[in-house]
UniProtKB/Swiss-Prot annotation:
Transmembrane segments: none annotated. Zn(2+) 2 binds at D204, E243, H352. Disulfide bonds join C319-C323. Monomer. Its EC number is 3.4.11.-. This is Leucine aminopeptidase 1. Keywords: Aminopeptidase, Disulfide bond, Glycoprotein, Hydrolase, Metal-binding, Protease, Secreted, Signal, Zinc, Zymogen. Residues 20-87 form a propeptide. It comes from Ajellomyces capsulatus (strain H143) (Darling's disease fungus). PANTHER family: AMINOPEPTIDASE YDR415C-RELATED, METALLOPEPTIDASE M28 FAMILY MEMBER. It comes from the Eukaryota. It is found in: Secreted. Extracellular aminopeptidase that allows assimilation of proteinaceous substrates.
Length: 385
């Protein structure tokens, strides 16, 4: 996500922290090597430039977001030419009683226990050894979640990348190949010195990672879903390398487009745990529904989901171009949406620093995001899309 002013946070690197951390040597990036350390980025429609990796981080420190489209340049792929999929979303919620019963099983304690471990990895930087190890641990948790359910056909797979950290895709097959996707990004970053400094990434995006995992666990308690009786297939994605220009999610949706996958919707959950900004501004707790660079029909349906399934309301807000992984789905023609923890200006200023820790999070607020995720996925799994 965006980057706060480091100086205002008083984030100064100590001499002990600046020392190289064992097992943090960056893992090679073959795409970077081809272009002698240069990357092609897109900061807006048609606004592209070649930059070094340090220039990428400099742009991020200045609050600029972008797609890293180096792979597109290599493959002569032009996603802006892809037709946008048109989907008619439901006008009303159809499963209120059943979903609310399921939602009673969502657990704040599980969210906190998961995040305490997930943030203990020194960094989840996508080219670090600890970033690879965190992905391995996350994969094991997802695998365990599926194994403990009755969903015998559900599966989890690694989506490999040229860098060290893989993306993860969990699939619950339905009656058709029409697919409903929920995503979060698993990587973290300290933008001061990405390959050296700690990046616990509790809110960005440990919170989203935990939120959708908990939603998956409870969704699998539905016998109809677990036994593959839903009309539509459901997927949960945990992307690598979001912080470096949406690299992991771009690779996933590029592959899906190549394979003619029928993705009907994609919801991104990035930063779901920080409520202090809203409270300190004197406003009631709420979730932030993004309205720019998203699918209008899906976004309007999400408003209904929040109203029907959450104990708090929503505010409308904007986050700009390429601000999280939903943008990759949209880039390849799939309807996408994004729900964040608050109005954008009230979101956490601790992200991308050593201070993005579990202690800053509101697990009651995260539970609301889990309810929204569960409600949306269940409704769309059984919808005529």
């Amino acid at each position: 996500m965006k980057f706060p002013n480091l100086l205002s946070l008083g984030v100064a690197a100590s001499t002990t922290v600046l020392a190289a951390v064992p097992n943090q040597k960056p893992i090679g990036d073959t795409i970077e090597d081809v272009h002698l350390g240069k990357f092609l980025i897109e900061l807006g429609p048609g606004d592209t430039r070649w930059v070094t990796e340090e220039e990428k981080w400099g742009l991020r420190r200045d609050g600029r977001r972008f797609f890293d489209i180096t792979a597109e340049a290599e493959q002569n792929v032009f996603p802006r030419t892809f037709a946008q999929t048109t989907v008619t979303f439901p006008t009303e919620l159809q499963n209120l009683a059943h979903v609310k019963k399921l939602a009673s099983s969502l657990s704040k304690n599980r969210l906190q226990t998961f995040l305490t471990k997930f943030t203990s990895f020194y960094t989840r930087y996508y080219k670090s050894e600890s970033g690879r190890q965190s992905a391995i641990w996350l994969f094991e948790q997802i695998e365990k979640t599926i194994q403990e359910s009755s969903a015998t056909e559900a599966r989890v797979e690694k989506f490999e990348h040229p860098w060290g950290q893989f993306s993860i895709i969990a699939t619950i097959p339905g009656q058709t190949n029409k697919t409903v996707v929920v995503g979060a990004h698993q990587d973290s970053i300290n933008l001061l010195m990405p390959s050296i400094l700690a990046a616990p990434g509790a809110d960005d995006d440990g919170s989203g990672t935990a939120t959708i995992l908990e939603a998956l666990r409870v969704l699998l308690k539905s016998e109809a879903v677990a036994q593959g009786k839903a009309p539509n297939t459901v997927e949960f994605h945990w992307y690598s390398a979001e912080e470096a220009g949406l690299l992991g999610s771009q690779a996933v949706f590029a592959q899906y487009k190549q394979d003619n996958r029928d993705v009907k919707s994609m919801l991104q959950q990035d930063m779901t745990g920080y409520s202090k900004g809203t409270m300190n501004a004197g406003h009631a707790d709420s979730v932030g529904i993004i309205t720019d660079f998203v699918d209008e029909g899906l976004t309007n349906f999400i408003k209904k989901v929040v109203t029907g399934y959450c104990g708090i309301s929503y505010v409308l807000t904007k986050c700009g171009y390429a601000c999280s992984d939903h943008a990759s789905a949209s880039r390849y023609g799939y309807p996408s949406a994004f729900v964040i923890e608050s109005k954008f200006e009230y979101s956490s200023k601790l992200i991308h620093t050593t201070r993005d820790e579990v202690s800053s999070l509101d697990f009651d607020h995260m539970l609301q995001h889990a309810k929204m995720t569960l409600g949306l996925v269940y409704e769309l799994a059984f919808a005529d899309l």
